[in-house]
Amino acid sequence: MIRITDAAQEHFAKLLSNQEPGTQIRVFVINPGTPNAECGVSYCPPDAVEATDTELKFDKISAYVDELSAPYLQDAEIDFVTDKLGSQLTLKAPNAKMRKVSDEAPLIERVEYLLQSQINPQLAGHGGQVTLMEITDDMLAILQFGGGCNGCSMVDYTLKEGIEKELLEKFPELKGVRDLTEHQRGEHSYY
């Protein structure tokens, strides 16, 4: 469910050594399955453990996950990274905003999942996002760009060289991708 690297476990173990005995960590998602989902880590003293929590035992620590957050933390990873600028804890949870779908799910759900979990996090760095509007009978994925992508001079490149290539590679049944957006250049546009 969640991978916690050795470096992160050591970091947590050090922090937990200053807490009440038996205290571990809790990993959670606020607003799971929505575009506003946020992940977090907190201390979890023994009296805060619920009967419905899942305990994940690692070499140096245990992590508790509540039953509502659990499906959205599939494939999550917590790491503690040190570089020239210092150290930071990173938590990557690709399924926090949308529950992972099975390979047998309808094509529209699988495409939507890929857009939300893989493509939109990349576009978010530029203040943009893309939404799947429909998949046509002739197997075209119709997309609409928003935020910083609307009116961006790089949107055609992003669509053809990024999104379309990835979607066609993952879903060979698709024949192409089209942009439905009426692009209007403005201050919101990234380029």
Swiss-Prot record:
**Required co-factors:** [4Fe-4S] cluster
Q: Would the keyword DNA-binding turn up in this protein's UniProt record?
A: no
Instruction: Tell me the GO molecular function terms.
Output: 4 iron, 4 sulfur cluster binding; iron ion binding
Residues given in the record as [4Fe-4S] cluster binding sites = 149, 152
What start-end ranges are recorded for coiled-coil regions in this protein?
Answer: none
**What Gene Ontology terms for biological process does this UniProt record contain?**
iron-sulfur cluster assembly; protein maturation
The record's remark on the cofactor is: Binds 1 [4Fe-4S] cluster per subunit. The cluster is presumably bound at the interface of two monomers.
> Known Pfam families for this protein?
Fe-S_biosyn, NifU
> Which key words are in the record?
4Fe-4S, Iron, Iron-sulfur, Metal-binding
Protein family according to the UniProt entry? Belongs to the NfuA family.
Q: How does it assemble?
A: Homodimer.
Per its UniProt record, what PANTHER family does this chain match?
FE_S BIOGENESIS PROTEIN NFUA, IRON-SULFUR CLUSTER SCAFFOLD PROTEIN NFU-RELATED
So what does this one do? Involved in iron-sulfur cluster biogenesis. Binds a 4Fe-4S cluster, can transfer this cluster to apoproteins, and thereby intervenes in the maturation of Fe/S proteins. Could also act as a scaffold/chaperone for damaged Fe/S proteins.
Name under which the protein is recorded: Fe/S biogenesis protein NfuA
